Amino acid sequence: MPIQFPIRSNDESIIRSYRERGFAVVHKMFSAQELEEVKAEVQHYLARDISGAKAGDFIFENNAEKSLRCAFRMHEHSDYFNSLMRKPSLITLVQRLFGDADAIADGAMLINKVPLAAYEFPYHQDNAYQFWTPPDAVGVTLALDESSAESGAIVCLEGSHTQGILPHQPSGVLGASRSLVSMPKAAEYAEVTLSLQPGDVSLHHVNVIHHTGPNRTANHRRLLGFSYHSSRSLCDEVARSQYERDLKIFLHKSQSGSKSLSLSDS
């Protein structure tokens, strides 16, 4: 049974949890008013014509409705989301995690688990495809809906961010490109579910092992994700370019069909 992870909204507690455990939760970081604005902007973003979108910008479910699963690189197509990922409160928080280095915003994306979605994002480490050295990078996730063990919340292996990158392989899952070749021993790390209410934010280290399960509820589970790295980190551009080429081939083979999307799909 995954451990439910509580944390007080205290800066030092959050930073200590992130550094020692590889993750943390900040409750009510976005007010109800701020959250409604973000939700409205998400709906506006998804209502536009996406027929000219680049391969991989949008991932759809393989169902009759072609429901949206993922929207990547939102900051490249929206001034609002480009600005939101640089929101001062987010930058200040991330900068605290990095210590004496500046926080650099990399991107914004939406992950939407539709009601009763059966798929899982397998266990993986983000740095298996981000390639940061040193691994001073973080995923910041804003809950637009309740995110629980039942709806497919992020589950982290506590302390796994300290061991470096393990061997990965193609996952075969649209929206989650890589997965661990083999899992660490069950007794080595505790599973911790990052349960979130709308407006809460989670932080997970780029090296922490994590996954998400199926959505067993009748509701959407939407998470808006932002990625950051520190000014002292460098990206292996050769490895990233090869990864992006491989991913493009996989997406081309795996997904085709309609690029239409209505508000009811999101």
Give, region by region, the residue ranges found by the protein language model.
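Non-heme Fe(II)-dependent double-stranded beta-helix
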Residues: M1-R21, H27-Y123, Y129-F131, H168-Q169, ...
